[in-house]
């Protein structure tokens, strides 16, 4: 039996997204823009380059208020052109 994400979380809660994408200057701005639409606030994402510098990992933490918000952000962040993966 699979445990669903909403069964593991108690809202509101802190929720961190790790977004992996192509190392372009606009990647961080695009991630923050999407997050701001669904969870307005002040964000200071952490950015780590890959060993070869081709990709960046952007970590951003929100205060999630419901499971729909979490799932919508996964979908919209994953739809960004520069993004390769969202964890």
Curated annotation (Swiss-Prot):
Q: List the disulfide bonds.
A: none
An annotated GO cellular component: cytosol
Q: Which residues form a coiled coil?
A: none
What InterPro entries would the database entry show?
A: UPF0250_YbeD-like, YbeD-like_sf
- Give the record's family classification: Belongs to the UPF0250 family.
Show the HAMAP family listed in the entry.
UPF0250
Record-given protein name: UPF0250 protein YPO2600/y1174/YP_1113
Q: Which organism is it from?
A: Yersinia pestis
């Amino acid at each position: 039996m699979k445990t669903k994400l909403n069964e593991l979380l108690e809202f509101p809660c802190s929720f961190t997204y790790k977004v992996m994408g192509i190392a372009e200057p606009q990647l961080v701005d695009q991630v923050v823009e999407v997050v701001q639409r669904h969870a307005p606030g002040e964000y200071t994402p952490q950015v780590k380059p890959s060993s070869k510098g081709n990709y960046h990992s952007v970590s951003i933490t929100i205060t999630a208020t419901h499971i729909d918000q979490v799932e919508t952000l996964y979908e919209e962040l994953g739809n960004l052109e520069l993004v390769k993966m969202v964890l």
